[in-house]
Amino acid sequence: MAQVRELTKGGVHHAFEVLGRKETAEQAFAMLAPGGTATIVGMIPFGQKIELHGFDFLRERRIQGSSMGSNHFRVDMPRLVEFYLRGRLHLEDWISAKLKLSEINEGFANMKAGKTLRSVIVFDA
């Protein structure tokens, strides 16, 4: 977080946590500038709590949740598909690993351990 605060000369105005991990939610909040907002999009496991320092709220920092990315499926999904088909949305860049069905257990273990973020099972044609 120190490097982010240094590069931005005091922190970011908006930070988005999208992995669903306790550590990255805490990091998103820690890198905020005074008055900044951290939005938690990722699904942090049920029952897991994040830890924040009360002092940081004196700097008017905020943290908020997001339900399903606050999307509107009927409007957003057709637009996202169109962006993908036109080459404006590069979904392949979001894939950490491509797996065979026989590797699913290893892939799940890697995801759970934080070694990969998004795996895709590839079936032979």
Give residue spans per PLM region:
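C-terminal hydrophobic helical "lid"/dimerization subdomain
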Residues: 6, 10, 14, 26-30, ...
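Active-site-adjacent beta-strand anchor residues
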Residues: 18, 66, 97
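Rossmann-fold dehydrogenase core element
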Residues: 36-39, 51-93
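Glycine-rich cofactor phosphate-binding loops and adjacent beta1-alpha1 units
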Residues: 1-62, 125
